Amino acid sequence: MRELAQEQAPITINTYKEDIMNTDIKQAMHVEAAKSFSSAEANENERRWNDDKIDRKNQDSTNNYDKTRMKLNFEIGTDGKIHTLGYHEKSLEVRLQERLSELCWKPFKPDSKIQPNCCARFIFGGNHDRTIEMAFGDQTVNLEKDADNSHLLRCEEIEHWAKDVYDWCAKRYGQENIVGFQVHLDESSPHIHALIVTVGQRTKSGRECVMWSAKFGKNRYEYGQILREMHTSLYEEVGSKYGLERGDSIEGRNVQHLHKRDYIRKLTKDAKQAEKAVKGLQTMTRRLESQIFRSQSQLEEIEKSLASGKIALQEYEIQKTR
């Protein structure tokens, strides 16, 4: 019996918010259930764009695609090796459909109000400063729009990290089910996009089939448990090797469900609020420093007066403790 569609898995916003604040060096992993995958999404992941398309995308204030860094993007192919991004002859959505066909997956009728989940979309990342360091080492990176970063070279550490994440995914979901694994170094923070078909076995026949619940549980409780275990496993097998702490799960948090555009807008808003908070702290620090300077000046004047005999010792002790 075909598995019924489940509610789309949430994208958690907590870890990346902490990355912007630079309070923790954490890994980040977000997973979302998908009922389809469009050619537009595939083109974005594989950067099958011309310059005009990139310029149009960058007109949106939430986007920052650096054309001078796009040559540094890469992907890990079905052979488990590093390749230039977009090296496949077939596009990502075509490869996904081929894998689904191999598993005899069929969606519900077109007019159905619900559809089964056919794959999982992952984003792997981490603390901004740490991932930038893994990708570019001590090279100077200008993250402003239209900046020229053509001098940058890709460091091996980001390749090792990506390969370790790939191996982690392959062990959990099967290498044959990793349809796409793209690493983007041309945006604000280096990150990975992984498109994975979730496969299980039919109870009676034992045949492999597309089955979301086989990997992510049959309900929210099971999903929460699995997600927490995934964060721990990813940290133990990958993150700890690169100085990244365990990421946050959804347990005990007010997790919001956001589409990508709304998610990026929230991150931008959080960044501005963080910048405002820092400026407030800087103002407070300057005021405290000014107050300390005035107090020190007053104390020096009192000590001079004491030395010249203008005030008595008892009066000096009283003024000193004020």
Predicted regions located by residue number:
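N-terminal nicking endonuclease/strand-transfer module with a His-rich metal-binding environment
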Residues: 1-322
